[in-house]
């Protein structure tokens, strides 16, 4: 998917067959109706360094190098971040 000009980027560190990852990505997509941001999904199993770093923490949402949440969607934290960058 093409990036939206001027949109913030939320990176989701994920892995295949991770229902928590799927749930978190779906929750982020619902916020795209209120905020302009792109979602980049990175498979941690595609890179040994990422797998070592994130291991069992997935899913992890990061923005500008800062972790916003892991395991489950923290809508308050993500919304607070997105409101500061409007």
Residue ranges and their predicted role:
Residues 58-67:
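A short, hydrophobic beta-strand/beta-hairpin element that forms part of a small beta-sheet core
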